[in-house]
Amino acid sequence: MRSVSYVQRVALEFSGSLFPHAICLGDVDNDTLNELVVGDTSGKLSVYKNDDSRPWLTCSCQGMLTCVGVGDVCNKGKNLVVAVSAEGWFHLCDLTPAKSLDGSGHHETLGGEEQRPVFKQHIPANTKVMLISDIDGDGRCELVVGYTDRVVRAFRWEDLGEGAEHPMGQLVLLKKWMLEGQVDSLSVTPGPLGVPELMVSQPGCAYAILLCTWNKDPGATPTSEGPMEGHSGAPGCPGRCVAPDLWPHPQQERLHSPHRQHQASHSPDSSASGLFALCTLDGTLKLMEEADRLLWSVQVDHQLFALEKLDVTGNGHEEVVACAWDGQTYIIDHNRTVVRFQVDENIRAFCAGLYACKDSRNSPCLVYVTFNQKIYVYWEVQLERMESTNLLKVLEAQPSSGSCWESWAWILMSCPPPAPCFTKPSTIQTSLHSAPPRAPRTPPSWTGFLAEQGAFCTSPPPPPPQLSGIWKTGSAHYWGRMAAPLGCGDCRPPGRLGEGRDKLPLCPFPCVPHLSRQQALPLPRAPYSCCL
């Protein structure tokens, strides 16, 4: 297990207290760039944008906000912010700016009156977790709410009017499930036939899969909340629970796999339902395929309280991201390769996803809420690879496209040059020679050579800008503390290579004036333009 360090961090001001699920990332203003939404126990909803430490705008809600989300809950093609309080108040906030930003980049109403929800409705109280997603495969989003009293309810938005600027309608109860254990998290995963399945994690070493088949039953129609309140479920829509002795108590998240989705959608007979990850408070992490196939299990020595998914390598496969109370964060890929990252503060809430912090583009980020009234956003959380490697293996994997910049950088670190770039391995001299070494008589294909051992480089790069200077003796240049005469056919044809020291190739950098023997030339800040 290797450790990484991310240094690109933004500290956001946050003075309230929040529940673990009252934080999320999403595009609240429909500009394709994600923002950070945080709800506190006083009912204040704060939206952070870019790298500004202050909230971009705020919205005042009623009650203690226990969970927030961003999505097209009204199925209008427009994202809204959803905030649900412990008292059962459901809020819709339309935070798309109607006015331009001021000179400092803040919304014009930030310094004046706070934003207000455009819609509010009372639903059953004691909310804990929330999910906005298509759970029945009809192409429309539903709102799924998990409660502290072991109940899960599914709602759908029903329009009561058209043409209004803000939504006009109400939430209609679709289904109520009564479970045997507490609800810890909600997630959606594709089923065997590509139909979404609603997954609920529970204590007692179990999770439940709740089937939503009201669209397939002609006699089943959405009803109002009142008549459905006392029902445990309509016929044809049972809750399917896994036996309690199969899986540990999970906090779960859907783990996206393009290959698995492709197989499920094009192979109707396949029983594969994709991948999902599980974690427990005692530090157990598992990756599951289908309901009974364990791909791998990892045990760590920290108490894990949050589990997310994030593509940190850019290969299209999302990695599992688990966070512990003490700030230890684990990133694990499909092959059980583990990378860890430490935040030096205790954490009370965590989320991961895409956030537009810099350069007006979304990038992978990790968000930590501490007990010291701070929110830390680590942006550009990316890794070239998950597995450990060394520099020689990198060149061996890319013999044709390997950069000579990397080759010379390795040379400066006193590493042997890799075989793909050099025709002959060489022992690098780290001391500065006062005179150029004797070149080989008949090099196979000469545009540059290294000192002492006759290793040849087919396309030496311009001097790295971090070196202190170039030493020149005759027509040979020396970089830093390395004895490496250079020649580059890209700038001007090299001279004839003879037996004597005066027959070295012509200077590869015509923009550099001729210097006398052992005269130091300060290196410019930028590489030579003639060799780019």
Curated annotation (Swiss-Prot):
The keyword Cell inner membrane does not apply. GO terms for biological process: cellular response to amino acid starvation; cellular response to glucose starvation; negative regulation of TORC1 signaling; regulation of TOR signaling. It comes from Bos taurus (Bovine). Part of the KICSTOR complex composed of KPTN, ITFG2, KICS2 and SZT2. SZT2 probably serves as a link between the other three proteins in the KICSTOR complex and may mediate the direct interaction with the GATOR complex via GATOR1. The KICSTOR complex interacts directly with the GATOR1 complex and most probably indirectly with the GATOR2 complex in an amino acid-independent manner. FG-GAP repeats lie at residues 19-48, 126-155. The modification Phosphoserine is found at S104. As part of the KICSTOR complex functions in the amino acid-sensing branch of the TORC1 signaling pathway. Recruits, in an amino acid-independent manner, the GATOR1 complex to the lysosomal membranes and allows its interaction with GATOR2 and the RAG GTPases. Functions upstream of the RAG GTPases and is required to negatively regulate mTORC1 signaling in absence of amino acids. In absence of the KICSTOR complex mTORC1 is constitutively localized to the lysosome and activated. The KICSTOR complex is also probably involved in the regulation of mTORC1 by glucose. Residues 248-271 are annotated as: Disordered. Keywords: Lysosome, Membrane, Phosphoprotein, Repeat. Pfam families: Itfg2 (PF15907). It comes from the Eukaryota. Its main location: membrane. The gene is ITFG2. GO terms for cellular component: KICSTOR complex; lysosomal membrane. This is KICSTOR complex protein ITFG2. It is found in: Lysosome membrane.
